Regions:
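Short glycine/proline- and aromatic-enriched beta-strand/turn motifs that initiate or cap beta-hairpins
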Residues: 24-64
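Structural signature of outer-membrane beta-barrel domains
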Residues: 42-44, 78-82, 110, 134-140, ...
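Gram-negative (and chloroplast) outer-membrane scaffold detector with strong preference
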Residues: 69-149
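Short loop/turn motifs that connect adjacent beta-strands in outer-membrane beta-barrel proteins
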Residues: 25-32, 68, 111-125, 176-185, ...
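Residues on the lipid-exposed face of transmembrane beta-strands in outer-membrane beta-barrel proteins
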Residues: 37-41, 59-63, 103-107, 131-135, ...
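Predominantly the C-terminal beta-signal and adjacent terminal strand-loop region
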Residues: 98, 174-236
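Residues that define the transmembrane beta-barrel architecture of outer-membrane proteins
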Residues: 31, 51-57, 97-101, 125, ...
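Extracellular loop and loop/strand-boundary signature of outer-membrane beta-barrel proteins
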Residues: 44-47, 84-98, 117, 152-158, ...
């Protein structure tokens, strides 16, 4: 009888402790991994005069060292375009399909600041900067190399290229918390500048500056897999 009472008491105590510990973790937990996708609105900078807006779609996998330090592998597919064969003096105009693969580190302000008890700091904690490295493949789908205004003028270049690039990004991640105060859905809004180590992303090899393109990006991420705890409360 005594053993039964002791066993029941220990079991009750263990249950209470487990409940207390569990409740203590509410607001501290986050998932180690995210998967997501985004839509980007592109603008190209290179050897053409007239800018044109195009789109790209991004798929990403994230490893979260913390809620505010993220290692991101991403694949992006889209189109780039620019120029005007008739009105631009050198007649350059192109359209290209591209795909890129990149690794990027993202650091959010919440990793560096104390946002507890401060409304402004709490709002700024999801602001982030990031950079990395990747490779971009482009294939020209249409191009004009001859000038209408200067007959005989021709701009050389390649129709297919693969080049290293560096993405630099700034943005804000809106975290949506579940009933356990865990950030399970994230809305990502950002601006990304992709600096290419080469001059033929547009199919033209004529300038002394490398090509680049910028993006306004909006996307969503979903948490998956293992859940762990952060050193401080995530949501206030």
């Amino acid at each position: 009888m005594t053993k039964l009472i002791v066993r029941t008491a220990l079991l009750t105590l263990l249950t209470c402790l487990t409940s207390i510990i569990s409740k203590a973790q509410i607001g501290y937990d986050y998932a180690r991994y995210d998967v997501g996708f985004s839509l980007g609105f592109n603008q190209f900078y290179g050897d053409v005069v007239t800018a044109k807006s195009t789109k790209g779609v991004n798929f990403n996998f994230n490893y979260n060292q913390s809620p505010f330090i993220n290692y991101i592998f991403e694949a992006q597919f889209g189109k780039l375009a620019g120029g005007d064969a008739i009105n631009d003096p050198l007649g350059r105009q192109f359209a290209a399909d591209y795909q890129y693969y990149a690794l990027r580190l993202q650091l959010q302000a919440g990793e560096l600041i104390d946002y507890s008890g401060n409304g402004l700091a709490n709002a700024l904690k999801n602001l982030y900067i990031g950079s990395g490295v990747g490779i971009i493949y482009s294939k020209i789908s249409s191009i004009n190399r001859y000038s209408v205004q200067f007959p005989g003028y021709y701009t050389p270049g390649l129709d297919k290229t693969s080049q290293i690039f560096v993405p630099v990004r700034i943005g804000y991640e809106f975290k949506i918390f579940n009933k356990y105060q865990r950030p399970d859905i994230k809305i990502d809004v950002g601006y990304q500048y992709n600096a290419v180590f080469g001059d033929e992303l547009d199919g033209f090899n004529s300038g002394h500056l490398n090509d680049a393109y910028s993006q306004f990006v909006i996307g969503v991420k979903f948490s998956i897999g293992e859940v762990t705890s952060y050193r401080k409360q995530i949501n206030f």
